[in-house]
Amino acid sequence: MISMLNQQVELKPILKFQITQIYSHSLIQEIKALITRLVLQVWRRPATLMAGIIQPLLWLILFGGLFYNAPINLFTINTSYNCFLSSGIIIFTSFTGALNSGLPLMFDREFGFLNRLLTAPLVSRTSIILSSATFMTCISLIQVVFIVTASLFMGNSPLNSDSTMIFGLMILLVTVGVTMLSLALSFTLPGHIELLAFILVVNLPFLFSSTALAPLYFMPPWLQLIASLNPLSYAIEGTRYLYSSVNWNFTECVIKISWGDICLGQIIILLIALDIMAAYLVSNILKAKLN
């Protein structure tokens, strides 16, 4: 009897369910749930998606109509200005859509929803960034598809299967790189006013300092230098090369700049390198902010 009293009795509740199963969501499930939330936001308020389609479409129609009677050989050989412009507007559409990708996350910060996510028992806080990046990349690609379709009705010839793969790769690289930078800005800047101001300041200068609206040799020397440093110029010229060449290859010269000739393969390597640099920069910023 004494030995039984000396024994320690451990009381345990009888559970009818396993608590660990409630919080055992994988990273993919978290990303899927967060993307579903963002999809519902766009479904209920599609104005942002429509604006991202209408704005570049107006550029394509109105600016293309402005130079409708321009000589065929004025900008490039045997190419109308509408065909010349469409490549620039396609890249500009992906750039603009990706640049706005930090706004939903910024509003989540200001309205307190991000704090709820950070205090939730997530498998990884990286799912917050991956879901936003994946969703905004898909939105930008949807906008690009609409602009590509519109450009076909304005005289652009459709790409073949191989050209479409390289074209899609360049669009994806531009979109992912700019999306990561925009998400980093949404954590760095104090509010949505500053982020909107940054977008307004950066958007049009990047367009006019690239080869989207005019070829490089039309520009003064100082603007040629700026356009040569603009990554959008390389993506635009690569897209333009795919549209204008049937038998394209990775080693043929695409754009001539002051320090050498750039081929299609070098453009893709450059875009990949810029994405890697952006990913490294953004990862360091997000680690500091999320932790």
Curated annotation (Swiss-Prot):
Membrane topology (UniProt): Multi-pass membrane protein
Record-level GO cellular component terms: ATP-binding cassette (ABC) transporter complex; chloroplast membrane
Main location: plastid
InterPro entries assigned: ABC2_TM, ABC2_TM_bact-type, ABC_2_transport, T7SS_ABC-Transporter
Positions of transmembrane segments: 47-67, 87-107, 135-155, 165-185, 195-215, 262-282
Keyword Chloroplast: yes
Coiled-coil stretches noted in the UniProt entry, renumbered to this chain: none
Subcellular location, record wording: Plastid, Chloroplast membrane
GO molecular function, one term: ABC-type transporter activity
ABC transmembrane type-2 domain: residues covered: 47-289
Keywords: Chloroplast, Membrane, Plastid, Transmembrane, Transmembrane helix, Transport
Protein name listed in UniProt: Putative transport permease ycf38
Organism whose genome encodes this protein: Pyropia yezoensis (Susabi-nori)
